[in-house]
């Protein structure tokens, strides 16, 4: 297995566990649904992580379950990675596994990070690396670029500073 693949799978499993209790349109609000037996509420744990600016969940038209988590910087992402919740779930799925140093490729002074975790469920397990019935799993990291527009609000949390973002919302609204 290529270096770095297993950590992505592990993070994906953690996302899967969190999404099992994640609402989609028409569902109950987060925290009102029962979590999988013995699984923590990952969305709540992400939101409670120092430096996490906000969390959103979604289900795409293609069937992906997605968590969007915005962090102030690399330090904040590492706080989540090393949190008790995250480590406990990693150990639960892969006990005794040694992990490489996370975020080695991410510069220390790079600013905010958007982590997008997605998973697509399948009828049966497809990968030897995990017993999960999935066809796809991914953890991707992104950074904001200058520009964009908004009117009446943004998808990103207000605490995320985007250079040269044009806000057309009338004052007082």
Q: What label would you give each PLM region?
A:
Residues 1-5:
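Positively charged n-region of N-terminal signal peptides that target proteins for export
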Residues 6, 29-30, 34-44, 100, ...:
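Aromatic-rich, lipid-facing transmembrane alpha helices and their immediate juxtamembrane interface loops
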Residues 58, 62-83:
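Short, well-ordered beta-strand segments in beta-rich or mixed alpha/beta enzyme
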Residues 75-107, 124-131:
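An amphipathic, aromatic/His-enriched active-site/gating alpha helix that lines ligand/cofactor pockets
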């Amino acid at each position: 297995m290529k270096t770095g693949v297993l950590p992505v799978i592990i993070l994906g499993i953690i996302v899967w566990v969190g999404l099992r209790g994640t609402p989609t349109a028409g569902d109950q609000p987060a925290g009102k649904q029962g979590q999988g037996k013995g699984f923590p509420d990952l969305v709540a744990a992400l939101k409670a992580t120092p430096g996490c600016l906000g969390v959103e969940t979604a289900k795409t038209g293609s069937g992906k379950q997605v968590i969007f988590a915005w962090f102030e910087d690399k330090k904040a992402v590492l706080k989540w990675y090393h949190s008790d919740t995250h480590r406990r779930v990693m150990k639960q799925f892969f006990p005794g596994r040694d992990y490489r140093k996370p975020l080695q490729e991410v510069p220390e002074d790079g600013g905010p990070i958007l982590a997008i975790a997605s998973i697509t469920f399948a009828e049966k397990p497809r990968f030897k690396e995990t017993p999960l019935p999935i066809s796809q799993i991914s953890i991707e990291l992104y950074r904001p670029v200058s520009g964009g527009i908004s009117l009446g609000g943004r998808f990103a949390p207000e605490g995320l500073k985007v250079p040269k973002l044009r806000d057309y919302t009338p004052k007082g609204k």
